[in-house]
Amino acid sequence: MTEIAKIPPRPKYHDPVVVERAVERLVKPVQEWIDLRAQFQPKDLKSQLTDCIHNNGYEYAKELEERYGWEPDSALVECLDRLDIQSAHQHVVRAWVTLYSVKIPFNIGDRVCTPTLRAGTVKDFDRSTAQLAVQSDENRDEGKDYRTLIDFEDAIPILGTIGEAAPAEGGAA
């Protein structure tokens, strides 16, 4: 079983290492945009892109204009729209799983809940990101095979379902 106390928390979308990873993929196309316009040469392109990060290319460009005097156009907005924080986050989480040898302490068939999922059954895993694919009881009852990805550390085992039968309530067992 994973010893949670020794493993630092799972990286979040807003963590500096995730933002840095996402911005690194923008530096080259934005630098090419700057080179074509020769309007200016920012002293620290990467830090300006990091300071103004936004998931909407237009808003991102607007922030660069307001804070650093950039003169954005549609080509820059298109470059900035390529920001992929989700991909960067997955990359950082995979590295976290590998670095700390994170193991999922659940089995397929285990019953779990979370603050946002009343109850469900573990149907599969994504070991690379230490996540459970859980089918909620509601989806099961409706005949839907939808699964929700849940970070393993957010899953709470439903008592009596991991390795042993639930005790009988209110009567003889």
Provide a role label for each language-model segment.
Residues 1-71:
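N-terminal intrinsically disordered, low-complexity, charge/repeat-rich segments that act as generic
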